Design a protein with these regions (language model features):
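N-terminal glycine-rich FAD/FM-binding segment characteristic of electron-transfer flavoproteins
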Residues: 1-210
C-alpha cells in the first residue's frame, strides 16, 4: 500500500489552517492512489495536542517529535529530521506533502536537497495517475496553469498553496496511533538561534486573508 506523509506547520502549538487543508488534499489523493495511508508529521515542542488533532482532520497515523530543539522554527533541524525519517522508514512514503507557507517552503526545499529528489512548489491542484502525482501549478501571476510531475524521483516532495483546497470538517473524537521519534540534531549541532519575534501590527497574514 502506498504511503503519504503530511508536514503539519504549527506555531507555538497551534496548527495553521493550511496544514489541515493539505491533510484534506492528502486524503483525496490517497483515494486516487487506491487507499494510501496518510501520516501526519508533527514537529515542535509541546505539540502532542496537534498530533492528536490531526486525526480529526483525516490522518490515519502520526509521527511526533516533541523536543526543545524544535521549539522555535529553524529550517535545518526540521529538514534534517524529515530526511532522516524517510531514510529510516521501513515503509517509505511515495509522497511528502506540506503547506506552501514560509516554513513549509523552507523545510521542503532543504529536505528535497538532502533526499536527492525534486520539489514541486505552490500546487493549486493535485491528482494521481499511473503511480505518479500530477500537480497543477500557477504561473505568470496565475494567468497560466501548468501541470508538473516528477516521474522518476522519489519521494515526490510537494507544497500546496494555502486556500487552494477546502479545509475538511473535523471528526470530533477520532483517534489514532502516534509514533514518537527523536530529533535528528542536538542543540550544539544547530548553527542558528531564535532570539525573539517582532510583531508587525495592523497587517493581516496573506495566508489568513479572506
Amino acid at each position: 500500500m502506498a504511503n503519504i506523509w503530511v508536514f503539519i506547520d504549527q506555531f507555538k502549538g497551534a496548527a495553521l489552517a493550511a496544514s489541515w487543508e493539505t491533510l484534506g488534499a492528502a486524503k483525496k489523493l490517497a483515494a486516487d492512489m487506491g487507499g494510501a495511508t496518510v501520516t501526519a508529521l508533527v514537529l515542535g515542542q509541546n505539540v502532542e495536542g496537534v498530533a492528536k488533532e490531526s486525526f480529526e482532520y483525516g490522518a490515519d497515523a502520526a509521527m511526533l517529535c516533541d523536543d526543545a530543539t524544535l521549539a522555535d522554527f529553524r529550517v535545518r533541524p526540521y529538514a534534517a529530521l524529515i530526511a532522516r525519517l524517510y531514510k529510516e522508514a521501513a515503509q517509505k512514503p511515495d509522497v511528502i506533502l506540506g503547506p506552501a507557507t514560509t516554513r513549509g517552503r523552507d523545510v521542503f526545499g532543504m529536505a528535497a536537497v538532502e533526499l536527492g529528489t525534486s520539489a514541486i512548489a505552490d500546487g493549486a491542484g493535485i491528482n494521481a495517475k499511473d503511480g505518479a502525482v500530477y500537480v497543477t501549478h500557477p504561473a505568470y501571476a496565475g494567468k497560466l496553469l501548468s501541470t508538473v510531475v516528477a516521474k522518476t524521483r522519489r519521494p515526490q516532495v510537494i507544497t500546496l498553496r494555502p486556500r487552494a483546497f477546502p479545509k475538511p470538517e473535523p471528526l470530533a473524537g477520532k483517534t489514532g496511533a502516534i509514533s514518537k521519534v527523536e530529533p535528528a540534531l542536538k542543540e550544539d549541532e544547530i548553527r542558528t538561534m531564535v532570539t525573539g519575534y517582532a510583531i508587525d501590527e495592523g497587517k493581516v497574514s496573506l495566508a489568513d486573508a479572506k
